[in-house]
């Protein structure tokens, strides 16, 4: 019995290994491994890390610092859903905590350390490419495509422009995997195949990954569901509507199952940040915005980017001149091989004679019209960006459509289908124009080489397609299709590698300290060269001291010294730039105020815009203090008590020298720098907004607290008339002290109030915070536009501020209920199937 069981197991395994799909996937894995070895050669075998400081500077200046902060908190056991190491403080649901690939990266960081974690970012990008290929192959397997068509199309999908361009922003690339998987289970639902019951689970996995991209995926999947049901024959309209509504219910169930994460992330995106702000226009203005054509330059960029994402780079993606409408990322990303352009255009021509029902043809022409209108006009970018300002970040949806049609067209050609020669020539001419324009403005030789390779492979593709117009022999046609497959590999590998060349990247090792001066001098000479290629290549070769600065021992010693010396909740800043422009605190583990955040707290942003716009650096997503150190009053107001500096002689009217640790000096603010303040007088927010100037802001912020329903004043001087001398004295003798948090989501402190008044906490005003005074729950107010505040009665009190991510409790309850509903519905399906089988028997 045992031997026969083993024989059956071996036979099953042998049959599995001989499966055409398994062999195709093995070959696909090997082909992608070789391709990625070439594309990422400088990152795998050279000194580059997939961390950019050019147009992709979010990776260096923001993302890796966020990841480092998360890893550091996990390693020392202090992780919480609020983080004071990021600016004035941030809800951790701002980040994609449950992106599976980022979770893998965090795990590497916890085990090996945050610095070593950075070495594996490019490995994770390659892993995404592999998973994307397998996911798309699985999706294509729901149809009757041939194995070669599925394999070559999945290869093109794995190296599509969106994953290789937007994938440089790490979490953005993951959607390229989730979307075809959602379509896969949607298709199983439509065809009533085994596994259709897992459709909501796939939506759940997407829902805990990203609210922003889940919305786009759901919108696109809903359209896919609608059009696929319309294509089906043999259904009444009532049955179609029922099937569509049931599919929508499955998606809603999946979102409900993900509410434990989805809802807190949605709270941040929709209620705190200003990422999705609209201009508040009326319906007619909104429709005009949706259907007013883009500029001519946009359409030219769109045409070029169908053939390559690198035709407008000019002299690189750093400080060199470029030819984009917006930039390398935000212009439409449409490339998924030159062959895909030819075949998608051909599809529109051959569809009318294709072997499918008239209903299916009409639906597909409708889909084509919808895609054309959605991409050519702002309506597509508007709808996919939550009906706000249009963006082009939804184009990952188009990659799936383009390559699905490419797979169909390849099988159509394999079966002897006729092609339209005129369209082949037209696309060839358009391709020639795009590559000619790109070559003319390409600055670096690497860009020109890529364009030449794309041109040659494009011409070879056109020649192969032209031959297919005339040759009827199936064997010869298969040879030509094989040649086209090889040409496609060269095409996408050349283009893919170019996305990662001539980039300003972080290096795996710093320039040695002893040659830093010499290398910096060489960089300056290159930067001022008359030769444009040398001049713009300078940023690529700029000497690096990132790791030396980020992990310097004396800075860690300074922070430990302050931690032992001062038990209160204080903030630290630096008067110099080291690892990043504004995110060193996240990486180095101290509480500052500088930050870079694309989804900035809208209340704090309004405070900065109103009172201290000089905190903005370059745009409204960066706050920096190193260039505002001289304003020690602002430092004291925000709780910046200590400054780390390389200067041993501070301005003694503002800071005093506290100590020296290594080569760093610790300066202490001469003013009373606290993270909380006491006031006896209030003014209205509107008064603060109307009156605040550079000349009177210290008086307005220092003498009164601004509340939403505070006292209206016409001039800053009126505050003194509102406060009698006794009230002024009581205010001066009162204090609010916060203790250093052990976990940032829990802040304790005490209040000494010699009169009734208000406490202002220099913590961003955000849903999720709750307050107790002497154990009794108290109401939190919005103070000074951007911060937490409360009323405080006279006397001595203890306070407790606690942060619970808004939406987390409700989301947890919702998730539990929807999971129960999911389990019950699946059990019901199983029972129905058993009943049906027994009735059939």
Predicted regions and their residues:
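Active-site lumenal/periplasmic loops and adjacent helix-entry segments of GT-C-fold
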Residues: 41-143, 148-180, 205, 290-330
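Periplasmic/ER-lumenal interhelical loops and adjacent helix-loop junctions
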Residues: 57-74, 78-81, 91, 95-103, ...
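Extracytoplasmic/lumenal acceptor-recognition loop(s) of multi-pass membrane glycoenzymes
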Residues: 90, 94, 487-549, 560-634, ...
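Contiguous transmembrane helix-bundle modules in multi-pass membrane proteins
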Residues: 192-195, 213, 363-551, 794-841
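Membrane-interface helix-loop-helix junctions at transmembrane boundaries of multi-pass membrane enzymes
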Residues: 235-245, 346-372, 595, 610
């Amino acid at each position: 019995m045992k031997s026969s069981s083993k024989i059956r197991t071996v036979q099953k395994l042998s049959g599995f290994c001989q499966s055409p799909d398994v062999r195709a996937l093995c070959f696909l894995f090997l082909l992608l491994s070789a391709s990625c070895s070439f594309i990422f050669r400088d990152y795998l075998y050279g000194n580059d890390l997939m961390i950019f400081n050019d147009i992709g500077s979010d990776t260096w200046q923001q993302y890796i610092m966020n990841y480092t902060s998360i890893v550091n908190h996990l390693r020392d056991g202090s992780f919480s859903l609020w983080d004071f190491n990021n600016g004035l403080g941030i809800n951790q649901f701002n980040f994609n905590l449950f992106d599976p690939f980022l979770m893998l990266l965090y795990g590497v960081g916890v085990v090996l350390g945050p610095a070593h974690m950075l070495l594996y970012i490019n490995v994770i990008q390659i892993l995404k490419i592999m998973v994307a290929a397998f996911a798309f192959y699985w999706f294509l397997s729901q149809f009757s495509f041939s194995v070669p068509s599925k394999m070559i199309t999945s290869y093109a999908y794995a190296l599509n422009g969106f994953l290789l361009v937007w994938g440089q922003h790490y979490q953005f690339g993951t959607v390229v995997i989730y979307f075809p998987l959602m379509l896969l289970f949607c298709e199983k639902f439509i065809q009533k195949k085994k596994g259709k019951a897992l459709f909501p689970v796939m939506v759940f996995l997407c829902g805990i990954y990203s609210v922003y991209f889940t919305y786009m995926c759901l919108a696109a999947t809903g359209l896919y569901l609608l059009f696929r049901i319309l294509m089906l024959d043999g259904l009444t309209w009532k049955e179609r509507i029922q099937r569509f509504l049931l599919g929508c219910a499955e998606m809603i169930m999946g979102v409900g199952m993900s509410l434990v994460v989805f809802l807190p992330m949605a709270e941040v995106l929709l209620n705190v940040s200003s990422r999705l702000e609209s201009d508040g226009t009326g319906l007619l203005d909104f429709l005009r915005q949706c259907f007013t054509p883009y500029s001519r330059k946009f359409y030219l960029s769109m045409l070029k980017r169908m053939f390559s994402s690198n035709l407008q780079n000019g002299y690189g993606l750093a400080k060199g001149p470029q030819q984009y409408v917006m930039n390398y990322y935000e212009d439409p990303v449409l490339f998924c091989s030159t062959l895909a352009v030819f075949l998608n255009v051909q599809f529109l021509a051959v569809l009318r004679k294709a072997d499918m029902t008239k209903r299916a043809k009409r639906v597909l022409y409708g889909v084509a019209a919808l895609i054309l209108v959605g991409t050519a006009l702002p309506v597509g970018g508007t709808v996919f960006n939550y009906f706000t300002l249009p963006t082009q970040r939804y184009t990952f949806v188009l990659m799936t459509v383009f390559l699905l049609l490419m797979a169909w067209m390849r099988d159509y050609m394999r079966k002897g289908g006729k092609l339209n020669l005129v369209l082949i020539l037209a696309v060839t001419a358009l391709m020639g124009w795009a590559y000619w324009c790109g070559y003319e403005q390409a600055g670096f030789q690497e860009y020109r080489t890529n364009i030449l390779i794309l041109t040659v492979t494009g011409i070879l593709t056109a020649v192969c397609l032209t031959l297919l117009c005339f040759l009827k022999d199936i064997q010869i046609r298969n040879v030509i299709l094989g040649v086209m497959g090889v040409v496609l590999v060269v095409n996408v590998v050349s283009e893919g590698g170019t996305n990662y060349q001539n980039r300003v990247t972080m290096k795996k090792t710093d320039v040695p300290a002893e040659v830093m001066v010499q290398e910096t001098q060489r960089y300056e000479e290159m930067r001022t060269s008359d030769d444009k290629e040398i001049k713009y290549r300078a940023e690529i070769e700029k000497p690096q001291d990132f790791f030396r600065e980020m992990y310097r021992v004396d800075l860690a010693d300074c922070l430990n010294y302050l931690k032992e010396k001062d038990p209160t909740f204080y903030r630290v800043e630096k008067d110099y730039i080291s690892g990043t422009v504004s995110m060193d605190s996240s990486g180095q583990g101290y509480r500052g105020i500088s930050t870079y955040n694309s989804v900035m707290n809208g209340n704090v942003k309004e405070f900065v815009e109103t009172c201290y716009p000089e905190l903005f650096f370059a745009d409204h997503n960066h706050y920096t203090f190193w260039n505002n150190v001289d304003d020690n009053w602002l430092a004291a107001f925000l709780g910046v008590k200590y400054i780390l500096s390389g200067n041993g002689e501070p301005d003694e009217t503002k800071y005093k020298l506290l100590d020296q640790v290594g080569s760093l000096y610790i300066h202490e603010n001469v003013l009373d720098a606290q993270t909380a303040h006491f006031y006896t007088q209030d003014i209205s927010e509107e008064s603060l907004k109307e009156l605040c100037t550079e000349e009177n802001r210290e008086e307005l912020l220092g003498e009164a607290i601004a509340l939403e329903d505070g006292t209206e004043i016409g001039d800053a001087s009126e505050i003194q008339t509102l406060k009698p001398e006794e009230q002024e004295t009581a205010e001066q003798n009162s204090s609010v002290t916060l203790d250093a948090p052990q976990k940032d989501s829990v802040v304790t402190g005490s209040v000494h109030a010699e009169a009734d008044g208000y406490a202002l906490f220099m913590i961003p005003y955000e849903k999720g915070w709750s307050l107790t005074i002497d154990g009794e729950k108290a109401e939190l107010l919005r103070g000074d536009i951007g911060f937490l505040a409360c009323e405080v009665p006279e006397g001595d009190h203890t306070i407790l501020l606690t942060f619970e991510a808004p939406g987390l409790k409700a989301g947890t309850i919702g998730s539990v209920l929807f999971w129960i509903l999911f389990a019950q519905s699946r059990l019901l399906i199983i029972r129905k199937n058993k009943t049906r089988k027994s009735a059939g028997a």
